[in-house]
């Protein structure tokens, strides 16, 4: 659990392909639309992939170009249907009634998000050329090996192919998206890495903590949790290893082993105030928030960690807003071509 009331992030859906493989459980996404990309009870798509207008499959490849560089139908379809799935959630009938004004508005929003994210692929490739950034042979080979290993997560080739189909992917597209993801990361690090690092070193704090969660946040009596927190505090003050105390007592399942890096305005106020008030190596008294009781230890900022997690840290960096503005401006400044049937793409026509 991270005690954030906001999360500013770099809005790149270039990582969607990697997210699709997280866990590799073999379970499919929810249906993209009630009539257009419905899933059966077994999780398999029941409609042939493609764009169907008036019942006829039509060619739409490429769907777009950006400064002359193509956005393939497969890429556009993947992004569009993935957004449709996320909007629909577990409601397999969500997209059935496109005459519903709320559904129609959601479809327009999905289409806008899809456009922006689809265009980011050629935008980043062109930006990489400007900066002289590229993937090394070793990086490309590593991605190819990872792609070759993906099938090993599944019991058979058929299961793997089914997983790809349910998630609107092909083998080739999954590999290309991973290549693009790594390239975009290198572009952002080249363009903003120094600024991100400087911001982290100046404005971030690094802490670990032990959380004793409230069993019932609404209860009037938290004496049992307070007693447990007091026990942890006494052990920490006596010099016991803080990592060992985290392993034994911590009830924050989202806390990484190295703890949290964050600036002001990210964590809940009590946690933030206590963290910034500490000196490196110092341990707080018991800090109460709406989540429970915390014992916080401040640690030095680790430059090697910062160097290898620049884009993760960028999400909370003041540089993030400038990054997003620059990416948006590059998209707006580009020359965009749309295929003839672009206006007819919707959750009711794209499968």
Predicted regions and their residues:
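Stable alpha-helical elements in mature extracytoplasmic
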Residues: 71-80, 106-115, 119-120, 124, ...
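Short, low-structural-confidence N-terminal segments
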Residues: 1-108, 112, 330-351
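Acidic helix-start/capping segments at beta-turn-to-alpha-helix junctions
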Residues: 99-105, 119-121, 125, 134-155, ...
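Second-shell loop/turn segments in exported
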Residues: 61-67, 101-115, 124-134, 169, ...
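Soluble periplasmic/extracytoplasmic beta-strand elements of cell-envelope proteins
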Residues: 63-73, 79, 127, 206-213, ...
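Peptidyl-prolyl cis-trans isomerase
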Residues: 231-271, 299-305
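Surface-exposed patches in mature extracellular/periplasmic domains of secreted proteins
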Residues: 131-139, 241-248, 284-287
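PPIase-associated folding chaperone regions across multiple families
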Residues: 26-32, 43-58, 158-224, 247, ...
